Amino acid sequence: NGAAVGVGATMQLPADIRIATSNSRYGFVFAKRGIVPDGCASWFLPKIIGIPRALELCYSGRVINSDEALKLGLVDYLVEEDQLLDKAFELSDLYLNSSSPVSVAMTRHMIWSLSAEDSPENAHIIESKLINSRGASEDAKEGVMSFLEKRDAKFSNKISSDLPDDFPWRKSIFKADK
């Protein structure tokens, strides 16, 4: 909402979903100031919009409007200013109330980690193991039953206690707890 230039542009990059208002502007102006991108922008930005587009925005320091940001894929949704919080709540409700929290957490780790692999082989191996363990979970049973009964699912598994033992990133999720 408003100008996101420099660190304002980079700090939103790690977000899974980015919502902008029609008055938003984005600028990666670091080279114009004699410095380089920060906030891991050199890692996130090319993953989000591609290397050539990331280079163009960083080389030029051009400030773009919200329409161009949406077109580039820098933001996922474009709304009017008075609809920003409504859209955020709508999406959070959609993601948090209709999907298994454990499956969402696992999917996030899998996509961020496995998309960096050189080939799909490791993704296939990990997915094959995890579909079996998650397929036997209470959440999977609830997901199927809610579909068959045409009702909303009520997932009971918790990230803190129900991540499968064979989930490769299990220890890194709970590292901060120790």
Annotate each predicted stretch with a short phrase.
Residues 1-102, 137:
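Crotonase-fold acyl-CoA enzyme core
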Residues 2, 30, 129-131, 177-178:
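Proteins with a high burden of low-complexity, intrinsically disordered sequence enriched in S/T/G/P/A and R
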Residues 19-24, 66, 75-126, 132-138, ...:
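C-terminal long alpha-helix characteristic of the crotonase
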Residues 41-44, 53, 106, 127-130, ...:
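Hydrophobic alpha-helical segments typical of transmembrane helices
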